[in-house]
């Protein structure tokens, strides 16, 4: 079944409109006036729900809620026997009509309830729920079904009989409900059975497909084992041929070396630099001979592409590129363990090299090159067959030879399975079988991947492609090489160490950690390295502008693609571990030249502008003043900056001394002008009155102006009271200076002003400052009471 279709069809307009009509039907039958329409309720439920099941369950709750209201109304009407009879004889109940079920008589059979009663809720395999159920379980609906004539008689006795008869009536209602539910469950069960049959057929088809895939995989595994057996037989044949060739070669080399030793003992040792041995022509001709032999030998048809074994219970066949498990278990004989599993010919690394003059390798190399070519001609057909099978089959081979066996193994760098294009290993790129004389250069194919180890061990040569292989006892990582000199250990000439005779590889042995940084061709690697470093140094001027450009467009969503390109360019320029070919670096230079104008726009480098006559000398200072003139601390900053300089130039400012004797004398006169009667009265005032002299008035004629404030925690804050006390007080009463505009702020202050004015009219003609202040406090209190 299409599960995705079920997940999306509930959002369709037709499905939602269907549920809206059901909600509206339930509301109409319940007879409840609601502020929201059925469409508003459905929209609220649709926004709240996240899945189909949640949406259907919320709609079902809403419909059940309205049906419960309808059932309560119908039960309330049952209390009247006559209304109950009329409602029952009139037709089916609203709940039964909503579900769409016909009424059932008392004689209808209730058989099969036990078997179908277990089908509680409909399974999710069916498409949409029936419109009456709205996705809910059938037993969760409160449905009032039709009553039989037997229940009509029971309803007539409800008002007259006991509670036990009411329970019997409820049981009969439940029986009618079960009949309706049974029919619904039968319909749902039939739909579920058809859906389950379709699903079962799909599962059976999938199982048949899986069985076919497993049979194909088993057939491929059998073919793989047969290929392994053929390869092992070929290895045994090669082993026998190599043993015969090595025995003949040992005998001939023993005789030749004895003659050379006798002839060279009379000559003084010639000092030659061991690191600069020329390559003789016989060793150079070996790769061409082997390549010609590989082309002329018989070509085996490539075996069928091997697919990795897949477990039988695997549901789908994985592609070969994603399988990283080895094809052959360790219990089986790996093809990498070729040639010699028993080491009969080993060499003793005795320190007898001191007695041997440095001229021997060159002479020995010329004599052994022809013999090695003959051995390679006999061994090459078997090697051709093995390498073709390995290269085309994509097998995983790893060398397991000890470094002192007579013939070395496959490269120590394991060939990855399925991740490198193995079809690139052509017949002409097969590894050579040759004697690793000290000056010999071994050509390795370009298509071999670099080994995973970044730096070789001391006993191994460099693992770069096209690198010269030193004559150490360890096998070359990417070629078939016999061990140096297959003679027995009793001959002192053959015990050579790689320290005396070796050819330097073009690249250093301590290669970088990143395997992708291994430089390619050997002849021009040093020149390209120097050219690469010069180009990188030349492009270093773009690093800072590129960083500023990246920071500028980092938050710009429209230029995400340009941002990723700029970041990759910056990584190439700044990260030394990320090496790239010189051509790539030249392309980066072209891209940076195109971006040069964009990068120079936001932050151009300050050009050296010569001072012209039009530019004002203090223009930067004026610009800074204009930029900060609105700052609140600007005046302080100017004072702190320029006052020390101005003081140093002009000296301290000249100011006259301040004479304050006259002012002090005026204050004494004012204090003496305040009458002592007024001073005593103010001192005896209530603490809630705060009295001060008005500093804005001068008492030329002896009149004292006072400002009084009301500080009472029980009264609100009001404007201060201004009094004018005459000089002959208490003979004359103090005057209130009416500031009416202060009381026009709000209605409360206006009420205070009215109360104060009316109370002042009630005071006697002669009154004191204390009486005036008390009247003021009473006016505020009265205004508070009137406002409350």
Curated annotation (Swiss-Prot):
The modification Phosphothreonine is found at residue 603. Changing residue 58 to D: Abrogates interaction with SREBF1. Residues 95-139, 260-329, 412-530 are annotated as: Disordered. It holds the Pfam family Med15_C. The modification Asymmetric dimethylarginine is found at residue 349. It comes from the Eukaryota. GO terms for cellular component: core mediator complex; cytoplasm; membrane; nucleoplasm; nucleus. This is Mediator of RNA polymerase II transcription subunit 15. Residues 260-269, 285-294, 309-329, 426-446, 460-482 have a biased composition (Low complexity). Belongs to the Mediator complex subunit 15 family. GO terms for biological process: positive regulation of transcription elongation by RNA polymerase II; positive regulation of transcription initiation by RNA polymerase II; RNA polymerase II preinitiation complex assembly; somatic stem cell population maintenance.
